[in-house]
């Protein structure tokens, strides 16, 4: 078993192998079957199963990735009820057709003799009322037919049940469900045939059946038809048992199917038992440049199922992501001090006071603003303008201010005139003012130069560092892209090596969202699933800082709780499932008067397309007879047995025996009544009628004139004698007396040719003639 497991692991899609080597599946199969490496005839063996796509077919059929309402039709296709009814109908027809009419008639005669229901016995009992005898006879035939029918059907049901148990077993017998799965997925059915089963194995099965059933020797002794029925049942059981044991439909998940590209030969191998089997091809696959294309329903439905599942999972992710109560859009402007001095100026104004009065009263604000203006210079000539503006704004009042010295004050040694004279000289140029301005200009230029040099150096260093980081990031991004490309190429090569080209059709698993499918978030509790999602999906945080400039800002934000319309996709997929399965397998939709679907059933075409090849091509069962009809496939077991019994030869035999038996009972009652009725009637005086007819008394009383019984003259005499004794028509009696011939009449015809009241008179027998009783003695008896 361990070797089988390792063998199966080596066959698993060639994982971990190099793309340049041959597929590991083919290498392993060549070890088992050396003929794969010889006699290629210019072709090569291609792996068509298992691949990711073919295994996906089976998963979709089981409803693993997605399930839609139309998918349920496949359950009706896969149902085994029709196969069971086919086995039951075949066994019943085959066994009942073995009943011989002679055996059935002998059993019927033995039955009526044992019960005392022979026609003579019933006439002896019920001759006064023949209708009662007929009713008793009808009841007897119906009772015996009912008991015989139930006995036969019970035996047939046991045989069919034993055959069905053998067909549905798991130990090497063929399974109809696996057959339908292969047919739907690939259109190819791998079958392992064991050859002809030995007779001893079939005999053991028959012995087990005899031990399990109640059709014992005592029943065979009571019924003459029992041996023939038993023999037919055992033969049918042995035939079906050999068919079921000789063929085995392989399991889908442990089978390898390969095809030769030149000869299109198909071979199948069991990965556990290493057995080789053949393939029953219902629809031929096609080999193309992109791989194997199957002519099957799943080949046409697979892509649509994956698309619908992707939309469904997208909707689920959107539902989980939009479950968060708050979604925030965050954005900010980047702090670019060196690149945008105007922004720094605004920040300084905001920090020191944006009002004009506050700016004029703060010397620090004026100085910082002067430095910023120096940084914003675009050419060297702007230095003079900036300095002059700063001096006019801050230094002008201090320099232009004239110190008025009053010489008339104490300590100055002057008078008022001198003061006025001094005041009168204010309009003249002030030499100290130019000197102070020159000194301040030089000092400011020196300090501004140092500050500007430092700022420019810092900006240059930042630009260099930024360029280096940008270059390094670009190099890393390029390496990452190249690595991803190489990984994708290796993965594609490995997939092509595994499936030998067919993987180009293989789509990735639809449920592999966020790298791996996690059952915790798939359809579980909403809050728990939401917590298991990545933070990038649930936070809904959008950062636009890198995309915004000085002139851009967030004017508004819109949060869309979008959920894809997956219901439309599901409806479309459901309709696609229905159309594909109904049309491919010719299924029949049963509806009520309102047009609502009641059930999906097999039609006659479906039975011919699916059930027929299963018995004829897979099981090679040749004694099944006609296929069961669609109206019989869905009847109950009892209704099916009743319906088939009415169509069998046994029912026709029983009807024939019933008709004959009832006729015999009526005839026996009529004869018995003819013989007994004269003893119940009073004698009549008919002498006057004789005289009117002109018949002499010697004709009436002459016993010696009576002819001997047995000749035609005696028949005429009997008729005339009956007519004379019972007052029959004189004219007819005269014609008989004259000897007119009315033809040779049998006993029944004679009785029918005269009136009913003539038929009840007995005539002298041979013993009466010998004893001398004659007609006179008969009249005395009457």
Curated annotation (Swiss-Prot):
<feature type="compositionally biased region" description="Basic residues">
    <location>
        <begin position="772"/>
        <end position="782"/>
    </location>
</feature>
<keyword id="KW-1015">Disulfide bond</keyword>
<feature type="compositionally biased region" description="Basic and acidic residues">
    <location>
        <begin position="735"/>
        <end position="752"/>
    </location>
</feature>
<dbReference type="GO" id="GO:0042025">
    <property type="term" value="C:host cell nucleus"/>
</dbReference>
<feature type="region of interest" description="Disordered">
    <location>
        <begin position="735"/>
        <end position="782"/>
    </location>
</feature>
<protein>
    <recommendedName>
        <fullName>Portal protein</fullName>
    </recommendedName>
</protein>
<dbReference type="Pfam" id="PF01763">
    <property type="entry name" value="Herpes_UL6"/>
</dbReference>
<feature type="region of interest" description="Putative leucine zipper motif">
    <location>
        <begin position="448"/>
        <end position="469"/>
    </location>
</feature>
<comment type="similarity">
    <text>Belongs to the herpesviridae portal protein family.</text>
</comment>
<keyword id="KW-1048">Host nucleus</keyword>
<dbReference type="InterPro" id="IPR002660">
    <property type="entry name" value="Herpes_Portal"/>
</dbReference>
<dbReference type="GO" id="GO:0051276">
    <property type="term" value="P:chromosome organization"/>
</dbReference>
<comment type="function">
    <text>Forms a portal in the viral capsid through which viral DNA is translocated during DNA packaging. Assembles as a dodecamer at a single fivefold axe of the T=16 icosahedric capsid. Binds to the molecular motor that translocates the viral DNA, termed terminase.</text>
</comment>
<keyword id="KW-1188">Viral release from host cell</keyword>
<dbReference type="GO" id="GO:0044423">
    <property type="term" value="C:virion component"/>
</dbReference>
<comment type="subunit">
    <text>Homododecamerizes. Interacts with terminase subunits TRM1 and TRM3.</text>
</comment>
<keyword id="KW-0231">Viral genome packaging</keyword>
<keyword id="KW-0946">Virion</keyword>
């Amino acid at each position: 078993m361990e070797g089988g497991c390792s063998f199966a692991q080596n066959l698993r899609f060639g994982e971990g192998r190099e793309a340049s080597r041959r597929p590991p599946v083919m290498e392993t199969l060549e070890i088992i079957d050396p003929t794969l490496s010889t006699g290629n005839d210019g072709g090569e063996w291609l792996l068509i199963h298992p691949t990711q796509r073919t295994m996906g077919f089976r998963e979709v059929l089981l409803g693993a990735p997605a399930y839609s309402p139309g998918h349920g039709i496949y359950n009706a296709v896969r149902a085994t009820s029709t196969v069971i009814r086919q086995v039951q109908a075949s066994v019943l027809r085959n066994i009942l057709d073995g009943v011989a009419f002679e055996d059935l008639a002998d059993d019927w005669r033995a039955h009526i003799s044992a019960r005392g229901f022979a026609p003579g016995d019933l006439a002896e009992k019920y001759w006064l009322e023949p209708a009662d005898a007929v009713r008793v006879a009808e009841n007897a035939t119906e009772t015996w037919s009912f008991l015989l029918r139930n006995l036969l059907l019970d035996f047939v049901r046991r045989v069919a049940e034993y055959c069905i148990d053998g067909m549905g077993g798991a130990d090497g017998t063929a399974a109809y469900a696996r057959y339908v799965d292969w047919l739907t997925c690939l259109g190819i059915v791998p079958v392992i045939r064991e050859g002809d089963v030995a007779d001893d194995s079939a005999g053991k099965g028959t012995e087990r059946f005899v031990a399990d059933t109640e059709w014992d020797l005592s029943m065979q002794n009571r019924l003459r038809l029992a041996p023939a029925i038993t023999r037919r049942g055992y033969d049918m059981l042995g035939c079906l048992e050999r068919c079921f044991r000789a063929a085995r439909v392989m399991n889908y998940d442990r089978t390898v199917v390969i095809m030769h590209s030149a000869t299109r030969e198909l071979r199948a191998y069991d990965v556990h038992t290493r057995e080789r089997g053949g393939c029953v091809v219902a629809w031929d696959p096609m080999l193309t440049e992109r791989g194997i294309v199957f002519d099957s329903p799943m080949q046409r439905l697979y892509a649509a199922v994956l698309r619908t599942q992707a939309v469904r999972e997208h909707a689920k992710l959107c539902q989980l992501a939009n479950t968060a109560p708050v979604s925030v859009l965050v954005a900010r402007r980047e702090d670019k001090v060196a690149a945008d001095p105007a922004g720094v100026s605004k920040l300084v104004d905001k920090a020191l006071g944006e009002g004009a009065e506050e700016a004029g009263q703060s010397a620090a604000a004026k100085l910082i603003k002067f430095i910023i203006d120096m940084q914003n210079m675009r050419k060297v000539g702007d230095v003079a303008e900036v300095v002059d503006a700063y001096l006019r704004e801050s230094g002008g009042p201090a320099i232009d201010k004239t110190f008025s010295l009053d010489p008339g004050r104490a300590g100055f040694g002057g008078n008022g005139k001198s003061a006025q004279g001094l005041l009168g000289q204010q309009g003249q140029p002030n030499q100290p003012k130019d000197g102070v301005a020159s000194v301040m200009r030089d000092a400011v230029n020196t300090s501004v130069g140092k500050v500007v040099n430092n700022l420019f150096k810092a900006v240059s260093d930042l630009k260099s560092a930024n360029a280096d980081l940008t270059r390094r990031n670009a190099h890393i991004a390029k390496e990452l892209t190249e690595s991803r490309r190489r990984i994708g190429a290796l993965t594609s090569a490995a997939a092509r090596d595994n499936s030998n080209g067919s993987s180009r059709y293989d789509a990735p698993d639809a449920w592999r969202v966020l790298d791996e499918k996690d059952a915790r978030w798939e359809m579980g509790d909403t809050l728990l699933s939401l917590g298991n999602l990545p933070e990038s999906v649930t936070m809904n945080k959008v950062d636009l800082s890198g995309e915004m400039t000085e002139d851009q800002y967030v004017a508004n934000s819109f949060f869309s709780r979008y959920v894809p319309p997956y219901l439309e996709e599901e409806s479309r997929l459901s309709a696609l499932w229905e159309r594909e399965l109904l049309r491919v397998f010719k299924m029949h939709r049963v509806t009520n008067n309102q047009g609502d679907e009641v059930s999906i059933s097999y039609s006659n075409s479906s039975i011919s397309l699916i059930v027929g090849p299963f018995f004829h091509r897979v099981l090679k069962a040749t004694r099944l007879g006609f296929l069961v009809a669609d109206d019989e496939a869905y009847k109950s077991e009892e209704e099916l047995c009743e319906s088939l019994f009415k169509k069998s030869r046994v029912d026709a035999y029983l009807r024939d025996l019933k008709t004959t038996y009832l006729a015999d009972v009526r005839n026996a009652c009529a004869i018995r009544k003819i013989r007994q009725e004269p003893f119940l009637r009073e004698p009549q005086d008919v002498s006057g009628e004789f005289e009117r007819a002109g018949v002499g008394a010697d004709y009436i009383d002459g016993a010696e004139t009576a002819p001997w019984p047995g000749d035609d003259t005696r028949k005429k005499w009997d008729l005339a004698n009956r007519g004379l004794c019972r007052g029959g028509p004189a004219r007819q009696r005269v014609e008989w007396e004259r000897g007119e011939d009315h033809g040779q009449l049998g006993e029944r015809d004679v009785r029918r040719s005269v009136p009913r009241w003539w038929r009840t008179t007995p005539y002298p027998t041979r013993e009466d003639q010998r004893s001398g009783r004659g007609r006179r003695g008969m009249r005395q008896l009457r």
